[in-house]
Design a protein with these regions (language model features):
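Conserved PDZ fold ligand-binding element
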Residues: 1
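Glycine-centered tight beta-turn/hairpin loop motif at sheet-sheet or coil-to-beta transitions
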Residues: 9-11
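Conserved Radical SAM active-site core
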Residues: 13, 22-166, 176-204
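Well-ordered beta-strand positions in beta-sheet-rich domains
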Residues: 15-17
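Positively charged, polyanion-binding regions of nucleic-acid-associated proteins
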Residues: 173
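Hard-cation-handling environments
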Residues: 189, 196-234
Length: 234
């Protein structure tokens, strides 16, 4: 028997008794997975795919979430820019891991530029707090040609690898570009040669990380291999 106390928005309380077997689902369905409002994104990223959506589609497709609870529950990636100290402490206290982090750049000034948020560089400090608390994380970099590639990508991989083993993985994906980019930051698609250079750098760091930590750590998305016309790794 499960005794359930429900408090409604008007203050009225219901006490329910549910009889069920130990492994049986109680049959409780919430309106949404968080039981309150989703936290929206505070950024204006230069590569945001939602800004590139076609018009006149359903409203929910245009909502930009940036909610650490969805990271834990559904695997969403978060930028950490709207995460308050109490949110960080809650994650640490209750071990709400893994936290999937949209990093994009470990250069604080560059991250501020890419996310169009003056607090984006400072938010990187939360990665260290999670690392020191033993909270597992996964990182992601959306690579933009001429912005966070080359030396900046190498810096990001190197500095994030310092957070092993709690930064468990780092994925590198090319920016997705659509025809709906009027008025947005000018970005160019990667070429075949660009993709080969990205893969060369990632493979180099995979070797370094494997020799030092026993894990390849950084992974290239399928698009890089397709664009470079190289075979997928075994």
């Amino acid at each position: 028997t499960l005794n359930l106390l429900i408090r409604k928005p008007d203050g009225e309380e219901w006490e329910l008794e549910i009889e069920k077997d130990y492994y049986e689902d109680p049959g409780i369905v919430f309106e949404n997975g968080l039981m309150d409002d989703y936290k929206s994104c505070y950024n204006k990223c230069i590569f945001c795919f939602i800004d590139q959506m076609p018009p006149n589609m359903r409203e929910t497709l245009y909502f930009k979430d940036d909610d650490s609870r969805l990271s834990f529950l559904q695997g969403n990636y978060v930028t950490l820019t709207n995460m308050k100290d109490e949110d960080v402490e809650r994650i640490i206290t209750y071990k709400l891991a893994p936290i999937n982090v949209s990093v994009h750049a470990m250069n604080p000034e560059l991250r501020c530029k890419m996310l169009h948020n003056r607090f984006a560089g400072e938010a990187l400090n939360k990665i260290r707090r999670f690392y020191e608390a033993g909270i597992e994380m996964n990182g992601q970099i959306v690579l933009c040609k001429g912005v966070n590639d080359g030396a900046e990508l190498e810096r990001s991989i190197r500095e994030l690898a310092d957070y092993l083993p709690y930064m468990e993985s780092l994925s590198v994906v090319p920016v997705g570009l659509t025809k709906f980019r009027d008025g947005l930051y000018p970005l160019e698609p990667f070429t075949k040669e660009d993709a080969k250079e990205v893969l060369e750098m990632i493979h180099k760091w995979q070797k370094i990380c494997y020799e030092k930590h026993g894990t390849h750590f950084v992974q290239a998305s399928d698009e890089w291999y397709l664009l470079a016309e190289e075979p997928f790794p075994p």
